[in-house]
Amino acid sequence: RNSGIRKHSSTDEYNYFRGAAATVEVIPALQLSGFYSHRSIDGVIEGNEITSIYKTGLHRTEKEADKVNAFTLQLMGGNITYEKNNLKVGMTGIYYFFNRSYQPVLRTYAKYNLQGNYFHNVGVDYKYRWNRFTLTGEAAMGKQGYSLLNQLKYNILTGYQLLIVHRYYSHNYWAMFARSFGESSAPQNENGWYLATEASPLAHWKFFASLDLFSFPWWKYRISKPSQGVDGMFQSLYSPKRNLSMYVNYRYKRKERDVAGTDGKVILPTYQHRLRYRLTYSPDHLQLRTTVDYNHFHSQGQEGSQGYQFTQSCSYAFSFPIKISVQGTYFHTDDYDSRIYASEKGLLYTFYTPSFYGQGFRFSACVRYDVNKVFMFLVKFGQTIYEDRENIGSGNDLIQGNKKADLQMQLRIKI
């Protein structure tokens, strides 16, 4: 909606369209767009019905290969946008359907999720600027349910901002490819208020604080009743020089969760505290980054668990067209709930932030070679060594040993 029609530049093999699209300026300030897509999607077919959609794009085994191009999806739609001065208003409509009925096996918490053959969404979006205020929002309807998202941004002074966001996504709203602001990745079954502020009262300092109050009108995974939660964050950034910066980030989250072994009859609040310190130093062609994370998790009336990690990364861009990046991580957590995340540089157009639990080391190295303006070659190698287990994974992914290695290569050709 905000950026209009654009190419698909990610390695994601699911969230994209394949077809034709065009935008025409009907009159000054008025644009009309149309698009059509027809593509095959991986999945599982049982009794001439689609029972699940396979989104990874991996076809390593016979079972995974059987899911290739299991059904087709056709999609068509359009958008009309008017923009003049400080006002922007648009309307978008989309209609899509499968060649088979989509009937997934849904548990109680997911009983209102998308199912059927034919779907549609219609939405209206707006943006208005007035002095230091910016108001944006969207309202949409689907085959069932509706969703609302409104945001008010106030630039108080230079370096001072205030943001208020409200969202309401009904429990039965269906929008297959939609992504929106919220606690969940999909705009469904959520209501909440988000308040954030940013301030730079001192030279080289920047402070950020946010508070998110959310609720789920229907059940969620491992929450067998309507529930609510709180997510708060505070961050302090200090940057005394152009090539030197550091920040401290604290995050608190409270949610509800079923107690294991009670079949959802007992639900208690859980509390999570995350603390991160990061130092970045970038002299000339070198960049050094140090990250320390701490995570504490506990459920009411139960003993808590904790985890921490230490990560050091180093990257260097040589005068000739080679860039090298290495990173090492040591992690130690009590269980999965106290897991930690460590982001890594990866292939182009990918975002890689793996989680770790248990005890061990992670090492990765990435080399990029720009042959010329046309060819670019990139290779990445990583290895994780666990100190608390003798086997990794299960089934076809079982590794007999405590070491797990991965190798990725990419060749880009610009025409």
List the predicted regions and their residue ranges.
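Long C-terminal interaction/binding lobes of large macromolecular proteins
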Residues: 1-4, 17, 21, 33-35, ...
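A subset of solvent-exposed loop/turn segments in beta-rich extracellular surface proteins, enriched
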Residues: 1-11, 40-66, 111, 115-119, ...
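Exposed, low-structure sequence patches enriched in small/polar residues
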Residues: 15, 69-73, 78-104, 111-415
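Hydrophobic, small-residue-rich alpha-helical packing segments that form membrane-like cores
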Residues: 18, 26, 32, 36-89, ...
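Short coil/turn connectors at secondary-structure junctions
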Residues: 29-30, 159
